[in-house]
Amino acid sequence: MSSASRPDRQQGVVITHPNRDKPVVQATRATVVVLLLVSAALVLVVTVGGWNLLEGAIPVQIGYIVVYLIFAFFAARWNRGVLPISAVLAVLLGIFAAVAGPSWFARDKSGFAEATLNSGLLGLLTLLIVPVQILLVTFALRGFSQGWNVELERRDGAAGEDGGRLAPAHPA
């Protein structure tokens, strides 16, 4: 949305986000996006690799993949609202993965239906989801506390004679 179409914006006022310029905040955002993408990729590999054995879990896993990709998009655009939801979903997925991982190793014996990928590999990938989700929770909550949404209003130096000083505080 342009500032011309928003009636609450004053002429000559520039909105800045000072916390977004800090290297630690940019690194946190990049880490959250990477962890969301890695999580989606791991769930995708486990879903495709065990497609014929997962039965009822397929819609849930596809849902996780889609939601994590959407959240990665929004986190890359500095939307911190997805961070606590990402953390909650990561806790749930981490619990599911911790419970499901050993069962893939149990299927590595004769008499069980074969998955597309080796059951041992699927077990390893499923258990690998757990530390990735722990990291995602940690970095998502860290990013949420960094104040990505903090805005400062300042006068545009070219628009007024006050030299770009801060505009009077307005509720956001």
Per-range role (PLM):
Residues 80, 121-135:
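Hydrophobic alpha-helical transmembrane segments
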Residues 72-101:
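Loop-to-transmembrane helix junctions at the membrane interface
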Residues 1-39, 135, 139-147, 156-172:
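Cytosolic juxtamembrane helix and N-cap/initiation of the first transmembrane helix
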Residues 33-36, 40, 61, 65, ...:
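Residues within membrane-spanning alpha-helices of integral membrane proteins
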Residues 53-82:
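Cytoplasmic juxtamembrane interface segments
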